[in-house]
Structures are given as structure tokens and as C-alpha cells.
Amino acid sequence: VGSEMCIRDSVQTVVNSFGVAFIAGYTATCKLYGILEVAATSYGFAMVTYTGQNLGAGKTDRIKEGTRIGVLIGVLTSFVITGLMFLFGRNILGLFISSDAAQGSQAAVVAWRFLRIMSSFLWVLYILHIVRSVIQGMGNTVIPLVSGIFEFIMRTGATLILPVLFGENGILFAEVLAWMGADLVLIPGYLYMRKKLLSGRSDQGDVQSAV
């Protein structure tokens, strides 16, 4: 716990080092993050239930098909939200940013840049939610845990390293890289679990045939 708090303090220190306007813009986009993620969260809950029910019924083929359709719907939804954010995001961000002349204008620039980055890679986040939920529905908690650790490592590493190389723009990519880090664990993990389920069903069928 102590090391985690130390890392969080270090990350916050990096954010704070870019000044008040950057902090305000960064925080404004983070507040909007919940809106970007809301559909992904809902899809995730649905996929946990769907996967669990079909697993219990022994319909593993439906899990594979449902995951494919779920990912497709999630990605399409993310594209729609991305389009909406590019059209109306600047106006929405204005609700979270102070109207103070100089700093307000600078904060708006940072917030808009950050929002465009996150929106452009929103499909990565939606895949994360859906695949993680399917794995949880299969009864596996280790893979989602490991993905969370990778997500944390990527976010922290990017926050501490990228600003040194690319300035304030570097820190704006930390969240997106964290999503990618999680997906790098979840997608192979899902493929492994799917193969394991299909293999188990095949073995069960062989036993029943022998009987």
C-alpha cells in the first residue's frame, strides 16, 4: 500500500509540474471520462451475465459468438461516441472549466487536446471492458487481476517517462497506453480461456461417446 501511494504521489507531482492551467484542463477531461465509459460499463455487466448463463448451460459456442458480437457493438458504439465528442466535446468541456480569461483559455486547449486523444482510442477501452467481463463470466479472476496490474504499470510508467521525452503531451497518452496494456493481457487471456473451454467440451463429448 505504501509503495502504491508513493507512486500515486509521484504521478500527481508530474501532473502538477505543468501548472494550474494544465491541471484544470486535465481534470476537466477526466471528469468527462465517466460519460465516455458509461456504455462500456453497461456492456460489461451484460457480458458477465450472458457468459455465465451460457457457460452454465454448456453452450460454449454461444460465448464465442456473443463475444464477437459484443466486441463489434462496443467498437461501433465507441466510434459513435468519438464522433459526438469531436463535434460537441469542446462545448461540453466548457461546463467543467472556469471562465477566467487567461488560465481558462489555456485549460480549454489542454482539455480539448486530451479529449481528442482519449476519444480517438476509445475503441481500445470498449474492447477492454467487454473482453474482461467475458473472462470474469467464465469464472476466471486471475487474468483480469493481471490485466489490472499491467494497466497500472503502463499508466504509471507512461506518466513518469513520456513527459520527459515529449513534455505535457506525453502525459496525455498515459491513459490510452494503460488501456492498451490491459488489452495485451486480456485478449490472449480470452483466447486461452476459450480454447480451454472448447477442449473441455471435446473431452466431455469423448467420455459420453465411450459410455
Segments (PLM) and residue ranges:
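Short, small-residue-biased leader/transition segments that mark boundaries at the very start
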Residues: 1-7
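Helix-terminus/linker motif at the lipid-water interface of multi-pass membrane proteins
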Residues: 7-35, 53, 93-102, 164-165
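Alpha-helical transmembrane segments of multipass membrane proteins
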Residues: 9-14, 35, 83, 130-134, ...
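Membrane-helix interface/capping residues of multi-pass secondary transporters
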Residues: 20-23, 141, 168-171
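Small-residue-rich hydrophobic transmembrane alpha-helices
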Residues: 25-89, 125-147
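Short runs within selected transmembrane alpha-helices of multi-pass transporters and secretion channels
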Residues: 44, 118-137, 143-158, 171-187
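Short alpha-helical transmembrane segments in multi-pass integral membrane proteins
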Residues: 51-120, 162-211
